[in-house]
Amino acid sequence: MSATNNIAQARKLVEQLRIEAGIERIKVSKASSELMSYCEQHARNDPLLVGVPASENPFKDKKPCIIL
């Protein structure tokens, strides 16, 4: 039973390694430049950079607190 378990685990490992070997890889310098370019192109749509208009902000209180 143990031998068949080991064989099954080895086959799974080999299959996983084949999948990982088939992944296309690129250099970090190219990936980082592409990421920076993407961020620059989409910066105007990023709510963390440009903010959310008060009229569209679902978390802004509609009316002030009466207690204060």
Curated annotation (Swiss-Prot):
Here the disulfide bonds are: none
- List Blocked amino end (Ser) occurrences by residue: 2
PTM text: Ser-2 is probably acetylated.
Question: Where is it mostly found?
Answer: membrane
Proregion span(s) = 66-68
Any one biological process term the GO annotation gives: behavioral fear response
Q: Which residues carry this modification: Cysteine methyl ester?
A: 65
SMART domains the UniProt entry points to:
G_gamma, GGL
Query: Which family, according to the similarity comment?
Result: Belongs to the G protein gamma family.
Q: What is this protein called?
A: Guanine nucleotide-binding protein G(I)/G(S)/G(O) subunit gamma-7
Per the UniProt entry, what species is this protein from, by scientific name? Answer: Bos taurus (Bovine)
